[in-house]
């Protein structure tokens, strides 16, 4: 992987990730394909929304279908027939979300398989081996996603262990001869001094990109913005920056304003299946009765297949009848909305008009522009 940085506007960056499998224009949003599929979508449909890279889930793909079946096909690209690049998370967040059924030690994490209850152990070395078999174009180190709230002492211990796991991840990645990219993950909760230590330690180890982890886990938005404002200027300018598990459209906008290049989140697909649809002026809850006889498109400014062909009334009807097509059409639209938003942000950065774009984005939704505390 090669990262090319074209231009900046304030702290926002316009560039691209270059892989053997294709080019990803940044800032970029990555749809989430947890089990080797973006739910309800064929790879061709995902590509048609404008997505150039997707995310797969190491933890879930390890449990099902498993490494051996994956290797029978070649790798995850061959298994799911996605031709572009794939980023896989390390399994750290899924382990974090298991809560009481896992035990974290210096060696790794002991937990029970959520499918059948069998005892399982996952550590940095195993995570690197699984992601190697998946053929991931971007591999994420294995870390502990520090929960929120966490006091300073716990956050420090967690961050320091994640740094040790980062070195173990780096060593195993290299010993496998993996020629793809490996990203480090910055931890430290909402504490700036701990984030500083994490950044310094990761940069000393050396990675192809740097992710900001441990955010969007329940902390106030102001804390997320503050940590991004503090961390991003410390990161190498020639490496991509990835905000993990984020988020709502406004979170993408605010991340870009603060220097983030990559995002992923289940929100557009999960919300689509629940009839919660993103449009230029905000959000449409298609289940509401007011859409029952509305013949207008979901979003007159959207060029997706759904908006070009179907009315709000039809989408409302599909939702009320619990038809599978409704979830699919909603997903097509939400993913296209996210990709159109990213394209708009990229164009605004190119033209040096990002803050004008941001102002219009919030004005259309009747909301104030969040403060930006950067030099």
UniProtKB/Swiss-Prot annotation:
Pathway(s) served: tRNA modification; tRNA-queuosine biosynthesis
Record-stated family: Belongs to the queuine tRNA-ribosyltransferase family.
Entry protein name: Queuine tRNA-ribosyltransferase
RNA binding: annotated span: 245-251, 269-273
Binding site for substrate: 89-93, 143, 187, 214
EC class (word): transferase
GO BP: queuosine biosynthetic process; tRNA wobble guanine modification; tRNA-guanine transglycosylation
Co-factor requirement: Zn(2+)
Cellular component GO terms, alphabetical: cytosol
CC cofactor note: Binds 1 zinc ion per subunit.
Organism whose genome encodes this protein: Salmonella paratyphi A (strain AKU_12601)
Pfam family, one: TGT
Record-listed E.C. numbers: 2.4.2.29
